[in-house]
Amino acid sequence: ELLNHKIDSIINVTISLKAFPGAQILVIKDGNKIFNKNYGFHTYDSLIEVSENSIYDIASLTKVTSSTLSLMKLYDNNLFFLEKPLSYYLKTFKKTDKGDILVKDFLLHKTGIRAWIPFYETTKNENGEFKKKTFRNKYSKRYSTYLTDSLYLYKKYKKEIYNHIKETYFVDTDSVLYSGLFFYLVPEIVSKLSKLSFENFVGDIYSSLDLNKTLFNPLRKF
């Protein structure tokens, strides 16, 4: 009863302060659920209540729950080596100033490369329209990567992202500095080493853990 009261108080106050519109709290001890309760709504318009069937976008945590997890699995299988340079896995980086950096330094955030690149800023022209070879509102063979029902990505846009990363600058090479740019490259590394698509490789890991609701592109399933 005391646990229930404490959790209720914390979540209700946090929702009232608009830290988030809703939440699901699950506490498991010794393999048993001792607390499982839903609070609030999906969004601040209060239209859809949080339920046990709610699915969450874990956003930047994907770096840990899919990319890093995949590299750990490949490392266990003796397919991925921390002491190898980036160019060992991605030949396209061979003649760049990023190519000789060890992958372990990317994972330790010791490369000194800037934290991120706002790729979206380069996708529109002065009139606010999408530039060629970026996005389109309708599906076609050239714009085949589904993002939303009205937004599709150019199939070779990954090359543009890679080029930005190749050309980006270093901020500080003498200290630990967070950078998420390496994680744009992990899916291709995983695919090359595993001979599977990144989505399928990660999906196999999740399936082995009975994480049936942890996946990419949930609208395909739910």
Predicted regions and their residues:
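Active-site SXXK
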Residues: 11, 25, 31, 55-84, ...
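Short, surface-exposed loop or secondary-structure junction motifs
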Residues: 98-222
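Residue-level marker of regulatory loop/turn positions in helix-turn-helix DNA-binding domains and
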Residues: 3, 59, 178-179
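Short, conserved catalytic-motif segment at the N-terminal edge
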Residues: 2-56, 79-81, 162-167
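Short, solvent-exposed turn/loop segments enriched in Gly/Ser/Thr/Pro and often Arg
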Residues: 29, 62, 86, 177, ...
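Short, well-structured active-site flanking segments
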Residues: 34, 45, 72-91, 192-220
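Generic hydrophobic/packing signal
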Residues: 70-75, 90, 107-114
